[in-house]
UniProtKB/Swiss-Prot annotation:
Subcellular location: Nucleus
Name under which the protein is recorded: Transcription elongation factor A protein-like 8
InterPro entries registered for this protein in UniProt: TF_A-like/BEX
Location of region: Disordered: 1-81
Bias type Basic and acidic residues, positions: 41-81
Amino acid sequence: MQKSCDENEGTPQNTPKADEGHPSEDPPQQAGENLQASGENVREETDGSLRGEPAEPSPEPKEDTPARHLNPEEVIRGVDELERLREEIRRVRNKFVLMHWKQRHSRSRPYPVCFRP
């Protein structure tokens, strides 16, 4: 049975209750304040997880990117090779486009076109 309008005005129906097991917004703010108050370094805080725990060290050391160890001549040779390959791809693509156009627009069909009266 439905309640009257007067009974429904005071209580919103779709608001979640705080005691349903949903954590409130205050504990993460307090945790951040406690980290700064305890004197921990800000860098340690950013390196750790979201909960403020320190990050686990990686099992193997991070290597530098190989591009940093190349001399400029090797980089220029690589760029020249990429440019040559792009030109070759462009030529082959144009060849296929031309072949496709010729096949579609040729007057001699591989099979006769029959029109039924």
